[in-house]
Amino acid sequence: MVYLPLQSFVLCLINISQEGNSMITQELKDRLIADYPKFEDMTHKFYKKEMSIADYKGQSGAYGSYAERGANSGMSRWRFNGGRMTRQHMQFLADSIRKHNLQHVHFTTGQCLQMHGLDGDTILNLYKECYDHGIYNRGAGGDNPNVVASILRGIDPRETLDITPYATAISEFLLEQMFYIKIPRKFKMGIDNGFDSTPHATFKDLGFNLTKHNTFDVYACGGIGPNPRIGIPVAHDVQPEDVLYHVKAMLMVFANHGNFKNRGKARTRYMPAEMGGAEAFIKTYEETLAMVKEVEQLTINPADYAYEITKTGKRDNSVENDRIHRQKQEGLYYVEYHPAGGDANVEHLLSALDYAVTLDQVEARIAPDQALFFINLTADEA
């Protein structure tokens, strides 16, 4: 067991101005790039055949990159909070495709982008260029993957609460916590809006399922793969502003009770049995949650992360089809691009990006089913 004093993980909240609906501090930004030289060194060694595939994989994943079969090329994984790509991100993606001649662009189930078939220098250049454009890939391929969120959050005509502020807050919180809490293996999270189940919140390592009361039911220790498990309900009717307390509590339980000795059994879904069963796990979870609430101030102010869609259009039902659907905003629509297996046709993607960046308030979102959605379009734009 790894003992982690609660006090050593107290989050230091700094009052900073909003930047693109983000509360990431400059201190954290600096930390996300501080160990880039280590990544640079290992990548140069690997592509010079001075490091084994296994050794490289064990380290490079923390920087969102893995070697590909044959060890002559690799991939670069780009992390987007809940799959959201701003207009600036879309322009950067289009520019990068052209600059680096990217031929294999893949949409992942974790709402990330992956660029395949890259040489070492391109991987390193993309890592730095992504950072300069507010895309933080540190941890994206390691034990701290992207938080998956409902793709239609904020625009779904059925929803009663926009979960965007809470999904963003969780994503940014995890970026900071990965430097403080050592967990034995990857920790997948999902948050949904109560209608869209694609985040699979009920069978993630930790998941938040929105209820009809605009509160969250919380599930833990779920997952697919070997020993698949539906998540254990650990809390009901949690106020949205309180979700970070549950994130911190689960991270600490995983750090203290996860299996560091056997990587094959290091995921959270193995943990309850090793702790004596679901009841024993829930008891520990609740005790840890109480301690976190006593020591830390992690209540979310949704206004810090929210952004308003002010664009409107004229409703035109004739444009709706299998790929074009109506948003809850007056006269606005979203378009779905769903390539087979999530592998984009680069020419088609570039055409879409080039057009989208010319439009007001349009953004793209990568879906958990490996599609790309362009949202906030008028009927004519769609």
Q: What is each of the regions a protein language model found here?
A:
Residues 45-51, 73-216, 245, 335-382:
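Small-residue-enriched alpha-helical segments and adjacent helix-cap loops
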Residues 117, 121-125, 129-134, 255-321, ...:
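Terminal amphipathic helices with adjacent charged low-complexity linkers/tails
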Residues 183-282:
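Mobile "lid/hinge" segments at catalytic clefts and subdomain interfaces of large enzymes
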Residues 58-66, 99, 143, 216-223:
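N-proximal short alpha-helices
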Residues 1-22:
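Short, Lys/Arg-enriched N-terminal segments with co-localized hydrophobic residues
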Residues 71-72, 149, 224-231, 259-266, ...:
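Short acidic (Asp/Glu) and glycine-rich catalytic loops that position anionic groups and cofactors
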Residues 64-70, 101-107, 256-261, 323-329, ...:
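Short, flexible, solvent-exposed loop/turn segments with mixed acidic/basic and small polar residues
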Residues 23-94, 283-355:
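Gly/Thr-rich phosphate-binding loop signature of adenosyl cofactor/nucleotide-binding cores
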